[in-house]
């Protein structure tokens, strides 16, 4: 199959001006194949275009990349949402997962680069908050949220917002009708870890009549139903860790969950749960969960505002959040999420959004890729096999041109120098 066939297939799924069509489709096709590093030099060598064309496209047309991600995610959601099926063993039909990832940079010199605490140290780079939609076992990335540092906001005359404020604005303005059509808000569950345990986020979700399962910090204030009815609103709150320690009458229950891996292992959790109140939010189900064969350091406290859900459904539903971690692994390992060397943040933003476009396109059944191919790496290898003869045709065309032999020798020398 010729590369032009694949580029035509890509162009038909996007609304891009004809002037930018070739460079955008060439960059997307480059991201959709296997390569050691997704650099502009490699993109130019792969497509036959000049490096400056990709550089100008990334620097000057970030809005095109953003709008393309939004249109592709809506098309994919409409394609896979009919009919909507319940999530595995759960009462909800769709899940929205909120999680952040860090894009590493070598230094603080690029625009909007910042030090972020991560694990036992720090990471220099950019932070992206990802919002992904899970429907019918399909993960669909929505437009990511970039974090703007205070110096960058000052230089660009932008109002500074924290990461939590950005998430609140995003969820408040997210209209799922544009993605899946009419739906019942009670079928939506929002999943987030303790990094997004914020009353404003939880109230924004509740105001949209959605459900949430959020891992709360051990110092989050809660109150039992009995105390809520008999004490003033401002008193008798205690940390959730102390709450479960003081309510030892709540018995431990063991649940068994099958993993989603190839080996299908069984995990055992022991849980305690009760109804209570989350301060500044309202009535929720409180769950204390920990692996049965691990120490207390792995203990999690979950809050769910769906009163009809069982404790087992809450624990199993929260485990769906792991799919976004696998998504982060795929875009970093296969699609070159961190392979960016530009100093301007507009170029970084364009590259990230084109990476998301490539991820969506690989799951939209490109020509030559059979549906039984599931992994993102396998899909890339299949696309590369379909384009296998493209490099031979490019070399023969270059050698037949005037001065083509010398230009091809220079290209080989450059490739050997980069290796």
Regions found by a protein language model. Give the residues of each.
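Active-site-proximal, Lys/Arg-enriched surface segment
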Residues: 30, 60-142, 148
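Short, conserved catalytic/metal-binding motifs centered on acidic residues
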Residues: 43, 92-106, 131, 187-197, ...
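Electropositive, glycine- and tryptophan-enriched low-complexity nucleic-acid-binding patches
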Residues: 53-57, 118-182, 283-301
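Short amphipathic alpha-helical "interface-anchor" segments enriched in bulky aromatics
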Residues: 102, 230, 241, 245, ...
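An internal, acidic/charged active-site-proximal segment
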Residues: 152-284, 369, 373-378, 383-384, ...
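Gly/serine-rich nucleotide phosphate-binding loop at the start of the catalytic core
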Residues: 1-68
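Basic, amphipathic alpha-helical segments enriched in Lys/Arg and hydrophobic/aromatic residues
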Residues: 339-393
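Long, charge-rich low-complexity segments
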Residues: 72-83, 395-419
């Amino acid at each position: 199959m010729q590369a032009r066939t694949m580029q035509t297939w890509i162009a038909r799924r996007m609304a891009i001006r004809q002037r930018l069509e070739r460079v955008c489709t060439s960059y997307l096709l480059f991201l959709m194949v296997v390569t050691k590093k997704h650099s502009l030099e490699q993109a130019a060598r792969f497509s036959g275009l000049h490096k400056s064309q990709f550089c100008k496209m990334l620097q000057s047309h970030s809005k095109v990349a953003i709008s393309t991600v939004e249109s592709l995610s809506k098309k994919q959601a409409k394609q896979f949402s009919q009919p909507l099926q319940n999530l595995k063993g759960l009462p909800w039909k769709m899940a929205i997962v909120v999680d952040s990832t860090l894009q590493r940079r070598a230094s603080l010199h690029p625009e909007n680069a910042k030090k972020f605490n991560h694990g036992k140290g720090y990471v220099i780079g950019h932070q992206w908050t990802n919002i992904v939609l899970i429907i019918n076992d399909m993960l669909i990335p929505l437009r990511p949220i970039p974090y703007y540092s205070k110096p960058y906001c000052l230089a660009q005359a932008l109002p500074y917002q924290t990461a939590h404020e950005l998430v609140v604005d995003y969820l408040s303005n997210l209209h799922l009708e544009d993605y899946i059509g009419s739906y019942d808000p009670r079928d939506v569950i929002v999943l987030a870890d303790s990094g997004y345990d914020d009353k404003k986020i939880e109230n924004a979700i509740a105001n949209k009549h959605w459900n949430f399962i959020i891992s709360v910090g051990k110092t989050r204030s809660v109150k039992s139903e009995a105390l809520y009815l008999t004490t003033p609103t401002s008193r008798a709150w205690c940390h959730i860790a102390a709450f479960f320690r003081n309510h030892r009458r709540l018995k431990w229950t063991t649940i068994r969950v099958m993993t989603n891996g190839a080996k299908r292992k069984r995990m055992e959790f022991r849980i305690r749960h009760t109804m209570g109140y989350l301060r500044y939010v309202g009535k929720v189900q409180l769950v204390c969960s920990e692996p049965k064969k691990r120490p207390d350091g792995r203990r999690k406290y979950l809050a769910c505002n769906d009163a009809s859900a069982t404790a087992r459904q809450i624990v199993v539903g929260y485990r769906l959040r792991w799919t976004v971690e696998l998504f982060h692994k795929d875009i970093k390992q296969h699609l070159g999420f961190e392979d960016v060397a530009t100093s301007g943040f507009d170029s970084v933003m364009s590259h990230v959004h084109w990476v998301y476009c490539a991820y969506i396109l690989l799951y939209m059944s490109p020509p030559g890729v059979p549906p039984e191919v599931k992994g993102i790496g396998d899909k890339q290898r299949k696309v590369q096999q379909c384009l296998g003869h493209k490099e031979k045709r490019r070399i023969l065309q270059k050698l037949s041109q005037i001065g083509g032999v010398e230009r091809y020798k220079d290209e080989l020398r450059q490739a050997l120098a980069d290796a």
